[in-house]
């Protein structure tokens, strides 16, 4: 998969280029990342990429011309039909399903805004989709772009050393992940790993993990549960958990 990054801070992407799964994917030629700095497409001696906002208001706005030229250059490198995604608080919220949707593209151009954003005319002329990573404000689109890239790259075939790691990730089946434990089996204070995980019974371990995924998702993200088509067994697990919770709460109140 090929990524084109439009950013005035291309150096930031060394963090994703040089470390971890992404670095390995680049080394193995499964992914390529090329940055296009809008400052390289300016004509004034100060390499100006922003200006004041028409109508007044605080903050600067990124200029149309340098950004449009950078996008054109990126398209000439990655392909003229490459989708342009603008990382923006006004966009649809990024999630696992959106990652799978974006993964259908062989290449993507990620536009990283700064200041108060980019000239609206650039969005109208060049941007295919706006994506947000959440309802909060960041200084620019570089960190969201890295987040999106990391999410997509780990979903590519053969990028993860163990394909089961991807299948068992949170959100892969619409549920949060189950709890994980490692050595020692018992901490000095006596806090022990659930015995089923030490049993060697893979069927029981799988059942325990499924139960934990359901309970954790019900507790922390009921909105996800509501979107799933649960089996009768899954529904029973959640219902039993709710009954146990009410019963436990009642016992505490009596004390």
From Swiss-Prot:
Biological-process GO terms, alphabetical: tRNA N1-guanine methylation
Q: Name the Gene Ontology molecular function terms of this record.
A: tRNA (guanine(37)-N1)-methyltransferase activity
Q: Where does the record say this protein resides? A: Cytoplasm
Task: Name a single GO cellular component.
Answer: cytosol
CDD domains attached here?
TrmD-like
User: Is the keyword tRNA processing in the record?
Assistant: yes
Q: Is tRNA processing set as a keyword in this record?
A: yes
Q: Name one Pfam family in it.
A: tRNA_m1G_MT
Q: Where does S-adenosyl-L-methionine bind?
A: 113, 133-138
What EC number(s) does this enzyme carry? 2.1.1.228
Reactions catalysed, as given in the entry: guanosine(37) in tRNA + S-adenosyl-L-methionine = N(1)-methylguanosine(37) in tRNA + S-adenosyl-L-homocysteine + H(+)
InterPro entries reported in the protein's UniProt record: Alpha/beta_knot_MTases, tRNA_m1G_MeTrfase_C_sf, tRNA_m1G_MeTrfase_TrmD, tRNA_m1G_MTases_N, tRNA_MeTrfase_TRMD/TRM10
Alphabetized Gene3D superfamilies for the sequence: 3.40.1280.10, tRNA(m1g37)methyltransferase, domain 2
> Keywords on this record?
Cytoplasm, Methyltransferase, S-adenosyl-L-methionine, Transferase, tRNA processing
Q: What interactions and quaternary structure are annotated?
A: Homodimer.
Hey, which family's this protein in? Answer: Belongs to the RNA methyltransferase TrmD family.
Looking up PANTHER family in the UniProt record yields: TRNA (GUANINE-N(1)-)-METHYLTRANSFERASE
Task: Describe the function of this protein.
Answer: Specifically methylates guanosine-37 in various tRNAs.
Write down what this protein is called: tRNA (guanine-N(1)-)-methyltransferase
Source organism: Francisella philomiragia subsp. philomiragia (strain ATCC 25017 / CCUG 19701 / FSC 153 / O#319-036)
Q: Give the taxonomic lineage as stored in the record.
A: Bacteria, Pseudomonadati, Pseudomonadota, Gammaproteobacteria, Thiotrichales
């Amino acid at each position: 998969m090929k990524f084109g990054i439009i950013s005035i801070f291309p150096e930031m992407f060394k963090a994703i280029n040089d470390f971890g799964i992404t670095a390995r994917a680049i080394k193995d030629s499964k992914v390529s990342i090329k940055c296009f700095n809008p400052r390289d497409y300016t004509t004034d001696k100060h390499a100006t990429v922003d200006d004041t906002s028409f109508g007044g208001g605080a903050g600067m706005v990124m200029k149309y011309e340098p950004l449009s030229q950078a996008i054109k250059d990126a398209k000439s490198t990655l392909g003229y039909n490459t989708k342009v995604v603008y990382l923006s608080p006004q966009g649809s919220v990024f999630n696992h399903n959106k990652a799978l949707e974006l993964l259908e593209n062989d290449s993507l151009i990620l536009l990283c805004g700064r200041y108060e954003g980019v000239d609206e005319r650039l969005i109208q002329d060049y941007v295919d989709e706006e994506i947000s990573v959440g309802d909060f404000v960041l200084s620019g689109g570089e960190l969201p772009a890295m987040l999106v890239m990391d999410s997509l790259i780990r979903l590519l075939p053969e990028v993860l050393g163990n394909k089961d790691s991807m299948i068992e990730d949170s959100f892969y089946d619409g549920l949060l992940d189950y709890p994980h434990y490692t050595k020692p089996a018992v901490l000095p204070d006596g806090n022990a790993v659930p015995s089923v995980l030490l049993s060697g019974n893979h069927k029981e371990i799988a059942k325990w993990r499924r139960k934990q995924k359901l309970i954790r998702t019900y507790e922390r993200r009921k909105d996800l549960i509501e979107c799933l088509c649960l089996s009768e067994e899954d529904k029973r697990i959640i219902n039993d958990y709710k009954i146990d919770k009410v019963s436990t709460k009642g016992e505490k109140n009596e004390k």
